[in-house]
Design a protein with these regions (language model features):
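Cytosolic juxtamembrane N-terminal segment immediately preceding the first transmembrane helix
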Residues: 1-28, 241
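Extracytoplasmic gate region of multi-pass secondary transporters
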Residues: 35-39, 160-171, 241-290
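C-terminal ends and interior cores of transmembrane alpha-helices
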Residues: 29, 90-105, 322-346
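Extracytoplasmic
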Residues: 16-44, 129-130, 266-274, 400
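Helix-to-loop junctions at the C-terminal end of transmembrane segments
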Residues: 68-81, 299-312, 337-339, 408
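Hydrophobic core of transmembrane alpha-helices in multi-pass small-molecule transporters
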Residues: 107-125, 258, 341-367
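Conserved MFS/SLC helix-loop-helix module at the cytosolic interface between two early adjacent transmembrane helices
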Residues: 67-109
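Central cavity-lining transmembrane alpha-helices of secondary-active solute carriers
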Residues: 56-74, 290-303, 396
Length: 453
């Protein structure tokens, strides 16, 4: 158990700028979680696609994080975190607006492009916002401060899920019921137009809301100016070499790759797993996912509080170990069925596998900010470039869900969705093993490495 500290987590004079940045965390949570269920929804909009092909949504979304992270670091290096945040928000807005022309083209690929642009903005935004939060106060409270800001992320996630449930999935199911065999091509096309308009609208409206946030940040004169050395005197090559000497940082990048892959895979295939287990519609499966995200949100606040008493690395190792056990429960617990209750919904069927799937989100709640905070320790002037490496590791969210989607197709796909989805959760299980290993490593090595100069 670590000693408690009275050091301020967020200085009072920058509380409003902190709230503005925390709102950014909520807004990328909204997009992330509004997007995950669409992997399955697009199977019905474009029935010619396979599960692995619709998983290209996540490939485009999280692949953009990899491609745009370095440009995000360059912006931070040359112009500072504030302008980096504004650049990221601007591209995020552009991506949301692109959903309108994509909906007119009646093809899957324009949506992939819109997702890529939107997520590219998120990559630049996260590359700047995460280290910006870390730099907003004392280094000894940096991980707790980042966990506090990240606690707003699941608030946006919940909003995204409710939007997806009521503004997308429920409406899509009404349209899907109109589709029958033998319909004329023109009738099918008209319904497809209606389906794509339903998908487009929430993203387009979110982009309009983000314009207001962009203006508030751009015009706020109290946003702190963070100086980590003269950008003109900092050699990128030597900084990269320095980062490659930091074993803790390199392990954090690897852990981040596997953790993000696990999170996106778990949440993306929640709908495949639950609908396959229970034989229900996507909008009904959303009720279980909402429980998971509520617990994810509450648990992130809980873990942030526990960090006053336990080292973040200890909590990371513990949560990762429990996540491994939960993954085993998801794989093998699908046949243990019982009746349960969902608040505000009513009686609902459950399996032990579904319970374990929900509890996995509790374990994941602290992982991203904790890995990011621990990995950023002792980087000094290398923090900006180091942050881009940690954000690039989000590439795991593009590759590992694609692997899990291919496993579902191999194990039976749509014809055996329940068992196929259950077996595919071996992918997150392996990822949590890596996160556990990093938690143990960080626990026994902190904080011994020298700060960069």
């Amino acid at each position: 158990m670590s000693e408690t500290t009275k050091t301020t987590i967020v200085p009072r004079n920058i509380l409003f700028p902190f709230i503005l940045l925390a709102t950014c965390f909520a807004m990328w949570g909204l997009s992330n979680n509004m997007t995950d269920p669409l992997v399955k929804a697009f199977l019905k909009i474009f029935p010619e696609l396979s599960t692995a092909q619709t998983a290209l949504i996540q490939n485009a979304f999280y692949g953009a994080y990899f491609v745009l992270a370095i440009p995000g670091a360059v912006i931070a290096h040359k112009f500072g975190y504030k302008k980096g945040v504004l650049a990221g928000l601007g591209i995020y807005i552009l991506g949301g607006l692109l959903f309108y022309p994509a909906s007119l083209m009646l093809q899957f690929s324009p949506f992939l492009f819109a997702f890529f642009v939107l997520a590219g903005g998120l990559s630049i935004l996260e590359t700047n916002a995460n280290p910006y939060i870390i730099a907003m106060g004392p280094e000894e409270t940096a991980t707790r401060r980042l966990n506090l800001a990240q606690s707003f992320n699941p608030v946006g996630s919940l909003i995204g899920l409710f939007l997806c449930k009521f503004a997308i999935l429920t409406k899509l199911e009404v349209v899907n019921q109109k589709i029958t065999e033998g319909m004329a091509a023109e009738e099918v096309k008209a319904l497809q137009v209606e389906q794509l308009n339903i998908v487009m609208t929430p993203y387009f409206i979110a982009a309009l809301v983000l314009i207001v946030l962009w203006i508030l940040i751009a015009t706020n004169k109290n946003m702190p100016t963070v100086k980590e050395g003269d950008a003109n005197q900092t050699n990128v090559g030597s900084t990269v070499k320095f980062l490659f000497t930091k074993a803790n940082y390199l392990f954090a990048v690897v852990a981040m790759f596997f953790y993000v892959g696990a999170q996106i895979a778990v949440w993306t295939y929640t709908f495949h797993y639950i609908t396959g287990q229970l034989g229900i519609e996507d909008s009904e499966a959303m009720n279980y996912h909402i429980i998971a995200i509520i617990l994810f949100s509450v648990s992130r606040w809980m873990f942030t509080g526990l960090m006053a008493f336990f080292k973040p690395s200890t909590l990371l190792a513990f949560a990762s170990f429990v996540a491994i056990l939960c993954s085993l429960g998801v794989i093998y617990g699908g046949d243990i069925a019982f009746d349960g209750y969902i608040p505000f919904v009513g009686p609902a069927p459950f399996t032990m596998g579904i319970v374990c799937l929900i509890l996995t989100s509790v374990c994941m709640s602290l992982m991203f900010p904790t890995i990011f905070g621990l990995g950023s320790r002792g980087l000094g002037t290398a923090t900006k470039l180091g942050a881009s490496g940690l954000i690039m590791a989000i590439l795991g969210g593009a590759l590992l869900p694609l692997l899990q989607g291919k496993l579902i197709d191999v194990f039976g796909g749509e014809t055996a969705m329940g068992p196929a989805a259950a077996k595919s959760y071996v992918v997150p299980l392996v990822c949590f093993v890596v996160a556990f290993a990093y938690g143990v490593y960080a626990r026994f090595t902190e904080p011994t490495e020298p700060v960069a100069t």
